[in-house]
């Protein structure tokens, strides 16, 4: 052993006996190291247990993202209970006194838990990245079951990578080369192997996580800017809210028999008993043209749809007609009404070339500059045959139903053209989603930063020792390795600092107020249930 001044040996029956097993350190060093590491270990255990209990008792924390944090807390708890205390004992005693089997079990548990922390951070980074960049496709698949599968894979990969090699390497090579009073991984005795494991276990994951976080940050900032532009676009004045409706002429030839002379006479005789058209207005057709069928909307059903590029190449026999409808009892000639009362829609009109030769449809001026996003409306029309030059309608024709168009849904619908109330609701929802995304990104950034700060010193020393074996002091090795453990202490603090729900739940649990809160909630709901 080094340093005879640290020893305190006496003799019994001529045999030297060492009463001071901590001969590498002075007494004050032992007390300081033991006290500091014990406090850090206690904070690590309490913090990660709080994370687990909070996830259990608070349903607001049972989100997919927090499942990954729960897995990370499990790995950190293992490190806080076993790794920190055993490694501190090894440092203070200067030798391993628990035997080779306990050494291998500790190393396997230590490396599996540490690698699981890295894998969980990698999974969290990918989860955040896909949630931000592919919100429609990925979030539909983002379920607790899938999160459990990813967590299981992270632990399984970590176990396969380290546990068999640590426990079985001495049997593969035929002997154990690690001295009895030391505890280290046998196959990491070569600096080149140590260098390779550091690259695979730290530098590659950190590089991937950093790239993903940079992209997450850019996408979040882009969405923040887009949301600000969207909020500005929906802040219109009262004068802009009330716009005159664009009347659309709807004329299409259906399979309806040409009116006879008797029917025309009846139509002219029924001018005074007309029905108000609530949705479609038109003009009389020419006498030389074919019979024109005028439609009155009875029922409608709206559905959101968005056309693809293929829909822009429709033939003329399958026209897209723009229709403006109004609610009952609000129509008057020349009356202006707000966007809440009127909607511009697109309806596919089916025509038959054998029935007519006149143009199939007319579009209002607004239709020429219609944006890509559209709303389909399924109308139930009543065909009314009009005599030439008449203004009134006849209710004696057949009913024809125009089926809704089936356009493929686009990725992100626009709020342009919607009513102000609906636009405001959509903007508010987007803002809430963006706030949640930013909070999750902040939590990820804090965890990632803590991971890089605590793990980088040790892995730099690993690279240095590959080229210079004696350049890194033993004390610095111990400090760097212990600093990796401190990451497990910092993680719960990051959750509390970045997530208000975690912070409030931690506070209630530490102050023993959670049970009181549950009782108050129970009494509140019982009181409300008794109200008439």
UniProtKB/Swiss-Prot annotation:
Biased composition (Low complexity): 270-279
Region of interest (Disordered), ranges: 263-294
GO BP: any one term: chemical synaptic transmission
Cytoplasmic-side segments: 54-66, 127-146, 215-443, 499-532
Cell compartments where the protein resides: Cell membrane; Postsynaptic cell membrane
Superkingdom of origin: Eukaryota
Keywords annotated in UniProt: Cell membrane, Disulfide bond, G-protein coupled receptor, Glycoprotein, Membrane, Phosphoprotein, Postsynaptic cell membrane, Receptor, Synapse, Transducer, Transmembrane, Transmembrane helix
Transmembrane segment boundaries: 30-53, 67-87, 105-126, 147-169, 192-214, 444-464, 479-498
Polar residues: compositionally biased ranges: 280-294
GO cellular component: dendrite; plasma membrane; postsynaptic membrane; synapse
Protein's membrane topology: Multi-pass membrane protein
UniProt similarity note: Belongs to the G-protein coupled receptor 1 family. Muscarinic acetylcholine receptor subfamily. CHRM5 sub-subfamily.
Task of the protein: The muscarinic acetylcholine receptor mediates various cellular responses, including inhibition of adenylate cyclase, breakdown of phosphoinositides and modulation of potassium channels through the action of G proteins. Primary transducing effect is Pi turnover.
Name used for this protein in its record: Muscarinic acetylcholine receptor M5
Natural source organism: Pan troglodytes
